Amino acid sequence: MSTVSQDGGTSRLRGILDPATHDAIMAAAERIKSLRCKRIARDEVNQPTINNWLEAMGIDNPRFKAGEAPPTMAQVWTMYGLGGKAGPDDPLHAMMNVLTEAGFTGVLGTNSEQKYDRYLRVGEHVRVETALDSIVGPKATGMGVGYFVTSRSTWYVGDEKVASMLFRVLKFIPKGAA
């Protein structure tokens, strides 16, 4: 059996995925692309969290002990926390659920592309907006057949954009599981 690739052509992925399943996944992706998850950080940018992050990363930069946060901490302020869960409007988690239900149970973070517009300062309150950027597949990989799912997150202080990130994961059927 052939599978349908993203461009509508056929590829030889040994019958792992039938065209109807692919079409359902891509239709769900189009619906999910309309979702926008907007979340406000539970805490302001603060020195104790910066200090803990610096210690964990082994960074000793006086700049970050004087009221500025490392740019790479942008995501830290809006994470769900240890007991937190993504809501139904979270596009990345919604797409991951669709793929899990279709049998793509493996997950592997592949890469992220980050851009920092400015340093955050202690006392600022950050918010993030997240959307599904793209889904590509099915692709045969060393891990198994899967889809690459990319989300786009943009962080703001007030109306000012301060950082953005493309985050890509591979959601796959582990080899030998099919």
Question: What annotation goes with each model-predicted range?
Answer:
Residues 2-30, 111-178:
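HotDog/MaoC-like acyl-thioester-processing domains
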